[in-house]
Amino acid sequence: MLKKCLPLLLLCTAPVFAKPVLTVYTYDSFAADWGPGPVVKKAFEADCNCELKLVALEDGVSLLNRLRMEGKNSKADVVLGLDNNLLDAASKTGLFAKSGVAADAVNVPGGWNNDTFVPFDYGYFAFVYDKNKLKNPPQSLKELVESDQNWRVIYQDPRTSTPGLGLLLWMQKVYGDDAPQAWQKLAKKTVTVTKGWSEAYGLFLKGESDLVLSYTTSPAYHILEEKKDNYAAANFSEGHYLQVEVAARTAASKQPELAQKFLQFMVSPAFQNAIPTGNWMYPVANVTLPAGFEKLTKPATTLEFTPAEVAAQRQAWISEWQRAVSR
């Protein structure tokens, strides 16, 4: 009788010892073997007595699209990889809960006062090029767009990618009502528009373009990991558009306490030290930057719309872009 009951007893008691799983939706380059994801996973699991499950999607806008589709049935406990340009749209979904993280725990340009979304890094959009191949890079966004130079350009889709959305807003800041004409000119130099950052940067490294939309911090990877200094970010006279990447916990999470603990962990040194050489962005906490970051392009001017401005105009500007590049 005891032998018959033993398997049943084990089945009944096994869940008691199973570790809880915290599911984090993020973008592919964060979760990749070469991204900060593995380091973050190891550090958090060492402290939480849980399993951290990273679910990778193509890019930041795709995260919001996926969450909208899944709604309250989403398996995500935390969404990591939205940004300052999606704050208003993300808030209006009603799918996120307050973070419990103090605003003064983070340090980003312009400050931070949102009680739902927590920054984990920041950076500036830029066009990266190979100095060995491009001797006279554009000195401004207008030069990139309007020059007679036959530069080959790759950027990301603003409907699926946060860098792509960043370029959309950057163009709008510089050109205003003339943005559609600027997009038409840039289209003549555009090799392709990708869904996400990883694909675009990979094509650039294969020699498919002269310039690729990325970040002022991207050359740090080549400097530190490859010991190469031939990649640089073009420094544009109009300034560079700021991106602050954020995470938030979902209101429907089955692990609300773990999700809140993860957000607190996100602004700690254990997470933040993985950002400069894992995500190749600037950390939001006071951690030491590695040697090599001092060589990076430093924008003289920071460009940014408010989240409300982006929310009010984003769809209209995307429609303008679609019409312009399809002509």
Swiss-Prot record:
Disulfides per UniProt: none
Residues that span the membrane, as ranges: none
Pfam families recorded: SBP_bac_1
GO cellular component: ATP-binding cassette (ABC) transporter complex, substrate-binding subunit-containing; membrane; outer membrane-bounded periplasmic space
Key words of the record: Periplasm, Signal, Transport
Regulation: Transport is inhibited by the sulfhydryl-specific modifier N-ethylmaleimide.
Annotated thiamine binding sites: D59, G60, S161, T162, W197, Y215, T216, T217, S218
Gene Ontology biological process: thiamine transmembrane transport; thiamine transport
GO molecular function: thiamine binding; thiamine pyrophosphate binding
UniProt KW Signal keyword: yes
Subcellular location: Periplasm
Signal peptide: 1-18
Assembly, per entry: Monomer in solution. The complex is composed of two ATP-binding proteins (ThiQ), two transmembrane proteins (ThiP) and a solute-binding protein (ThiB).
PANTHER family: THIAMINE-BINDING PERIPLASMIC PROTEIN (PTHR30006:SF3), THIAMINE-BINDING PERIPLASMIC PROTEIN-RELATED (PTHR30006)
Family (UniProt): Belongs to the bacterial solute-binding protein 1 family.
Function of the protein: Part of the ABC transporter complex ThiBPQ involved in thiamine import. Binds thiamine, thiamine phosphate and thiamine diphosphate with high affinity.
Record protein name field: Thiamine-binding periplasmic protein
Biological source species: Escherichia coli (strain K12)
Gene name of the record: thiB
